[in-house]
Each structure stands twice: as C-alpha cells, then as structure tokens.
C-alpha cells in the first residue's frame, strides 16, 4: 500500500509499505529517500508519536494515510574548557551590597551614583 510522509518544510514523500511493516522499517525507507538518520526521525500520526517496535497496523494506518515527520532535537554537553570560561565570566564578580550592581573582580568602589559609589562590596555567590 502507499502512504505519504509530510515534512515540516511541506515536502511530501510517497512510500510503498505493508501494514505489517514496523515503524523502524518506515524510518529506514525515509532514510533511503531523504538521507535523514532514523534516530533523528519522529513520526506522528493522529496526534500520536509512533514507537519504533510497533507496526503500521497497530496504529490503524491504512492506504494513503499521511504521517508527519518531525526531526528530533539533540542537546549537547559543554566542554570543560568552555564551562570554566563561562564560570569565570559569570561568577568571578563583585556585587555592591547597596544597589546589587555587578562589578569586575578587582573593584573597590561601586560605579553607580545611586548608592553613592559605595565601597561595601562582596564577592558574587558561587553556584553549587
């Protein structure tokens, strides 16, 4: 039977499948046509995300049904060197006790007029 897969760009892909095909098989066919790895694909039908081990028949997907293809977003880990740089930039500061202005680490007086250029400074608290 023939089904359609619609991408977020509006492109429609036509696939030749059987109702006994698994979602894994469908994703492999999409990879063959579009080059998108199966682990980045999410297929939606009738508002539900289709699970890899199930078949098209399990979801009552019939001929000429339309599935929606969404790409999975992946997060990443920040490298330790970038983490140290971010920590230095965000945490190595002095804070004015009167107006809460963030100041450079070697500050002696606040730079703001509203607290009278106070010399009551404290280091910024460290995040655990």
Curated annotation (Swiss-Prot):
Annotated ranges, domain Ubiquitin-like: 1-76
Molecular function as annotated in GO: mRNA binding; structural constituent of ribosome
Organism of provenance: Nicotiana sylvestris (Wood tobacco)
SUPFAM superfamilies tied to this protein: Ubiquitin-like (SSF54236), Zn-binding ribosomal proteins (SSF57829)
Pfam families: Ribosomal_L40e (PF01020), ubiquitin (PF00240)
Transmembrane segments: none
InterPro entries for the chain: Ribosomal_eL40_dom (IPR001975), Ribosomal_eL40_sf (IPR038587), Ribosomal_zn-bd (IPR011332), Ubiquitin-like_dom (IPR000626), Ubiquitin-like_domsf (IPR029071), Ubiquitin_CS (IPR019954), Ubiquitin_dom (IPR019956), Ubiquitin_ubiquitin-like (IPR050158)
Keyword list, A-Z: Cytoplasm, Isopeptide bond, Nucleus, Ribonucleoprotein, Ribosomal protein, Ubl conjugation
Biological process annotations from GO: translation
Positions of crosslink type Glycyl lysine isopeptide (Lys-Gly) (interchain with G-Cter in ubiquitin): 48
Record keyword rRNA-binding present: no
PROSITE patterns: UBIQUITIN_1, UBIQUITIN_2
Similarity comment text for this entry: In the N-terminal section; belongs to the ubiquitin family. In the C-terminal section; belongs to the eukaryotic ribosomal protein eL40 family.
GO annotation, cellular component aspect: cytoplasm; nucleus; ribonucleoprotein complex; ribosome
SMART domains in the record: Ribosomal_L40e, UBQ
Misc note: Ubiquitin is generally synthesized as a polyubiquitin precursor with tandem head to tail repeats. Often, there are one to three additional amino acids after the last repeat, removed in the mature protein. Alternatively, ubiquitin extension protein is synthesized as a single copy of ubiquitin fused to a ribosomal protein (either eL40 or eS31) or to an ubiquitin-related protein (either RUB1 or RUB2). Following translation, extension protein is cleaved from ubiquitin.
Coiled-coil annotated spans: none
Protein name: Ubiquitin-ribosomal protein eL40 fusion protein
Domain of life: Eukaryota
Covalent cross-link (Glycyl lysine isopeptide (Gly-Lys) (interchain with K-? in acceptor proteins)), residues: 76
């Amino acid at each position: 039977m023939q089904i359609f897969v619609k991408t977020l760009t509006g492109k429609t892909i036509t696939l030749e499948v059987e109702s006994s095909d698994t979602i894994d098989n469908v994703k492999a066919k999409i990879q063959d046509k579009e080059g998108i790895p199966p682990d980045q694909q999410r297929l939606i039908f009738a508002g539900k995300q289709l699970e890899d081990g199930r078949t098209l028949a399990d979801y009552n997907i019939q001929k000429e049904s339309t599935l929606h293809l969404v790409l999975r977003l992946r997060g990443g880990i920040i490298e330790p060197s970038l983490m140290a740089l971010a920590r230095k930039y965000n945490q190595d500061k002095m804070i004015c006790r009167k107006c809460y202005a963030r100041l450079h680490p070697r500050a002696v007086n606040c730079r703001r007029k509203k607290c009278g250029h106070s010399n009551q400074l404290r280091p910024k608290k460290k995040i655990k």
